[in-house]
């Protein structure tokens, strides 16, 4: 269906989603601290489990996925299905539109 893959979304809406759903555990800026989850700066084009100085699960390190718009689109729908064994305690964003908005924001904010 139309929600099957990434399409550019609304960055401002994505920023709000990040603040309410992600910012408790993640920072995005260069040099930002790791919190419960890793800092996300430089996320796009990086493999899973590679943010310097963060203690990942083996599942995350071994997933061998490269983060881009489409892998994030799948992952954020159901993180534990995409990477079984991840410690990210987030149920996912079921609406494709919300994932598009969030990923559009992440592309800008983590670059």
Swiss-Prot record:
Keyword tRNA-binding (UniProt): no
A GO molecular-function annotation: metal ion binding
GO CC annotation terms, alphabetical: mitochondrial intermembrane space
Binding site for heme c: 22, 25-26, 88
Keyword Membrane: no
Modification N6,N6,N6-trimethyllysine occurs at: 80
Listed Pfam families: Cytochrom_C (PF00034)
SUPFAM superfamilies xrefs: Cytochrome c
Modifications the protein undergoes after translation, according to the UniProt entry: Binds 1 heme c group covalently per subunit.
Swiss-Prot/TrEMBL keywords: Electron transport, Heme, Iron, Metal-binding, Methylation, Mitochondrion, Respiratory chain, Transport
Gene3D superfamilies according to UniProt: Cytochrome c-like domain
Localization terms from the record: Mitochondrion intermembrane space
InterPro entries: Cyt_c-like_dom, Cyt_c-like_dom_sf, Cyt_c_1A/1B
Reported function: Electron carrier protein. The oxidized form of the cytochrome c heme group can accept an electron from the heme group of the cytochrome c1 subunit of cytochrome reductase. Cytochrome c then transfers this electron to the cytochrome oxidase complex, the final protein carrier in the mitochondrial electron-transport chain.
Protein family: Belongs to the cytochrome c family.
This protein's name: Cytochrome c
Organism, as annotated: Aspergillus niger
């Amino acid at each position: 269906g139309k929600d099957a893959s990434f399409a550019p979304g609304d960055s401002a809406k994505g920023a709000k989603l990040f603040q309410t759903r992600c910012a408790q555990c993640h920072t995005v800026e260069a040099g930002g601290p790791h919190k419960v989850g890793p800092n996300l700066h430089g996320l796009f084009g990086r493999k899973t489990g590679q943010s310097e100085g963060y203690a990942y699960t083996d599942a995350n390190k071994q997933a061998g996925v490269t983060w881009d718009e489409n892998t994030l689109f799948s992952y954020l729908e159901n993180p534990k299905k995409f990477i079984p064994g991840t410690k990210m305690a987030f149920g996912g964003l079921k609406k494709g539109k919300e994932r598009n908005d969030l990923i559009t924001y992440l592309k800008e904010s983590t670059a």
